[in-house]
């Protein structure tokens, strides 16, 4: 079992095990990734790996922040929005293809570091969710759509599904890139 799994496994461990699993797969998928590969777009309307990696980090950071009921995030309070030169309001959801194409000139290592910082905040956030808290919503911080604020249970399920899919996207794009060179 991963080191962050609880001593007496419960509902949180499903999410913890899942994020550990896709995290290992993600690290494998980006190992040795060149900046040319990271910014390559299979079609003019496709996301590139670097943007997807950033979005994975933003999702872990945003959902960890939501699980905590607000407060500190790596993106804003931790200064990562400024450091990476991306508008603090963005998380990738709803980004236009022009925003993807015009993603800042960043190194893979910088974006990976942001993801890892966000993940280090996410794990304790998941661990603090008791069974009694699963139906809690935070409309007070979900200001763009307070009437659609998700339950903490929904967040625990959504996070590994979405980021597992994005990890698969990265591996797939990497495979497409290498096949175009053959």
For the regions a language model picked out, list residue spans one by one:
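Short, contiguous alpha-helical
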Residues: 2-5, 16-30, 35-94, 137-182
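Active-site rim elements
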Residues: 4-17, 105-112
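Alpha-helix initiation/capping motif
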Residues: 9-10, 74-77, 83, 107, ...
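Acidic/histidine-rich alpha-helical segments that form the ligand environment
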Residues: 86-136, 155-159
């Amino acid at each position: 079992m991963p080191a962050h799994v609880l001593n007496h496994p419960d509902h949180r461990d499903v999410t913890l095990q899942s994020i550990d699993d896709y995290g290992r797969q993600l690290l494998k998928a980006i190992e040795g990734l060149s900046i040319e590969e990271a910014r390559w777009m299979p079609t003019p309307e496709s996301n590139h790996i670097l943007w997807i990696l950033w979005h994975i980090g933003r999702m872990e950071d945003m959902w960890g922040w939501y699980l905590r009921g607000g407060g500190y995030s790596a993106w804003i309070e931790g200064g990562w929005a400024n450091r990476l030169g991306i508008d603090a309001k963005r998380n990738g959801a709803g980004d236009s293809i022009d925003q993807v194409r015009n993603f800042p000139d960043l190194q893979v290592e910088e974006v990976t570091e942001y993801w890892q910082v966000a993940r280090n905040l996410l794990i304790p956030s998941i661990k603090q969710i008791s069974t009694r808290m699963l139906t809690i919503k935070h409309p007070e911080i979900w200001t763009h759509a307070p009437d659609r604020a998700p339950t903490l249970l929904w967040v625990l399920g959504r996070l590994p599904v979405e980021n597992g899919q994005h990890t698969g996207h990265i591996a797939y794009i990497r495979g497409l890139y290498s096949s175009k060179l053959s």
